[in-house]
Design a protein with these regions (language model features):
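N-terminal, cleavable Sec-dependent signal peptides of secreted/periplasmic/extracellular proteins
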Residues: 1-378
């Protein structure tokens, strides 16, 4: 259809130097007012001009057909959406679009397209409610109210189905946990919890042998993060507890810092969940994982003039002093196409000197895009 062509921003229609611009709020007006607008004939080759002209012709035709309100409503909604996407002044096009939608809601409340219009209003309100803006007055609860109204008044309609999906996304539980990659052993540390639609979380700290790290966290064919969670749930935790989060019923994302008591030296996974069994049920429950080291050791890598050399300085994490006689093991991860997973190979080790310096020559002649080298300080 011609409208679909002109609605496509990627169409190859060339534009004149003084291209037609949708720069007046009158284009958001009623269908009757819109079809009466005199477009500038000098801009006949402009893409936006041709699109508006087609919308004028279509709406003029639909306005004469009193027996097909749905067709008129559908064309009018698409016209409003086109104007919004191509409106010159981006500062007020959102507000003009919202006002136009509210007008369409009243004008077409007695036809099925009214449900689609309601959904567009609910979706707009929900998106605006997510914005961190001091002048923002929209709330997700308003969007839910419009959805409930639509589902009640237009059951089985496309708009009602869209509203049901929007409600599910609004009620969806989000949860994540982040910490520093390395913390000092036996010292309390902070974690950032990001959440939505959650008031209480359950946490546990699981020790992970570094040699089993790749086996536990690798995802093979047909596996998902759920499989990682199952493997971690099979390991006895060193600690479990629960914590209440700051309550909020606004259906928005929030974050808060929590304190976690110190852990012994080692590598760990911390699981956070909305249920004490740490199991996933899409949308209804959530589980998140983060990993960290508890170590007194830190390091600084050095750019080597020789690409085959690994160079670094091993330091005490507390005072920054060099650590002598620290063992550094070097590894290569190479993707095995037959097994469809990365295979880890130890390449040797080296010991830091009095300045904490470590250097190890690693041949890269057999490496590829699907191979990488790394190290572990012990």
């Amino acid at each position: 259809r011609a409208i679909d062509y002109f609605n496509n921003d990627k169409s190859n229609l060339s534009e004149p130097s003084n291209a037609f611009s949708i720069d007046d709020k009158k284009y958001f007006g009623t269908a009757n007012d819109f079809v009466s607008i005199q477009l500038n004939d000098a801009d006949k080759n402009a893409q936006d001009y041709n699109a508006l002209k087609i919308y004028q012709d279509l709406l003029a035709f639909r306005l004469k057909d009193k027996n097909n309100l749905d067709a008129l409503a559908d064309a009018d909604l698409k016209r409003i959406q086109f104007v919004k996407e191509h409106y010159f002044n981006k500062d007020d096009n959102e507000a003009l679009y919202y006002e136009a939608l509210k007008r369409l809601k009243t004008e077409y409340s007695k036809c099925n397209v009214g449900a689609i219009i309601n959904y567009e209003i609910a979706n707009y309100i929900n998106q605006k409610a997510q914005e961190e803006n001091a002048t923002n007055t929209f709330t997700v609860k308003e969007a839910l109210a419009v959805c409930d109204e639509t589902i009640k008044n237009y059951p089985l309609s496309e708009g009602a189905k869209n509203c049901t999906a929007l409600k599910e996304s609004i009620f969806f539980k989000n949860l994540s946990l982040s910490t520093e990659e390395t913390v000092v052993p036996d010292g309390a540390f902070k974690a950032l919890v990001s959440y939505k639609n959650i008031t209480k979380i359950y946490l546990k700290i699981v020790p992970v042998s570094y040699k089993d790290k790749d086996k536990i966290f690798s995802i093979n064919n047909n596996e998902t993060q759920d499989d990682i969670i199952k493997r971690l749930n099979a390991i006895k935790p060193v600690r479990t507890w629960n914590q209440t989060l700051p309550d909020s019923d606004d259906y928005l994302d929030h974050s808060t810092e929590i304190k976690i008591d110190g852990i012994k030296k080692g590598y760990y996974a911390i699981l956070v969940s909305t249920n004490p069994t740490f199991t996933v049920s899409t949308g209804k429950e959530a589980v998140a994982i983060t990993t960290l080291f508890a170590s007194q050791i830190s390091y600084v890598t050095k750019n080597s003039s020789n690409n085959e050399n690994f160079e670094l300085y091993v330091l005490n994490r507390n005072d920054g002093q060099p650590l002598q006689n620290a063992t550094v093991k070097f590894y290569r991860n190479t993707y095995d196409y037959k097994q469809r997973k990365y295979i880890r190979t130890e390449l040797g080790s080296a010991t830091s000197d009095a300045t904490g310096y470590v250097s190890k020559k690693i041949s890269k002649q057999n490496t590829s895009y699907y191979s990488n080298e790394n190290f572990q300080v012990e």
